[in-house]
């Protein structure tokens, strides 16, 4: 095992800082330049910005879908109110005609009409 302790003096005899690769060759550790770290930070920042943009897009899409459903509900309600309005107008005309027929058939309203015509 690497990093074995010498029993004679208690010090390490072999310390390897590199991992062995799959093919048995030692892997060499390399330090990254400041430019590479900057590039990595930009990539991380870009990934975070992309994630924020994606979340914002998802939120907006959900909001649009909710508004579309609300609009559909309102449109259906408007159609129902229009239909009810037409029905009530029709009933109002029938009632108006009925009242007019009653008034013309009643002698009370006929005498009032003739008195008002005389004046």
Swiss-Prot record:
The keyword Membrane applies. It is found in: Golgi apparatus membrane; Golgi apparatus, trans-Golgi network; Cytoplasm, Cytosol. One of its GO terms (biological process) is regulation of protein complex stability. The keyword rRNA processing does not apply. Gene3D superfamilies: 1.20.5.170. It is a peripheral membrane protein. Belongs to the SCOC family. This is Short coiled-coil protein A.
């Amino acid at each position: 095992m690497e990093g074995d302790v010498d029993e004679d003096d208690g010090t390490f005899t072999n310390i390897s800082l590199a991992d062995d690769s799959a093919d048995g060759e030692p892997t060499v550790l390399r330090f990254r330049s400041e430019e590479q770290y900057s590039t990595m930070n930009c990539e991380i920042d870009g990934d975070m910005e992309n994630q924020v943009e994606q979340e914002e897009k998802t939120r907006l899409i959900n909001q649009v879908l909710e508004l579309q459903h609300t609009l559909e509900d309102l449109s259906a309600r408007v159609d129902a109110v229009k239909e009810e309005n037409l029905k009530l107008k029709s009933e109002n005309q029938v009632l108006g005609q009925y009242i007019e027929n009653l008034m013309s058939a009643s002698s009370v309203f006929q005498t009032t009409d003739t008195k008002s015509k005389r004046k």
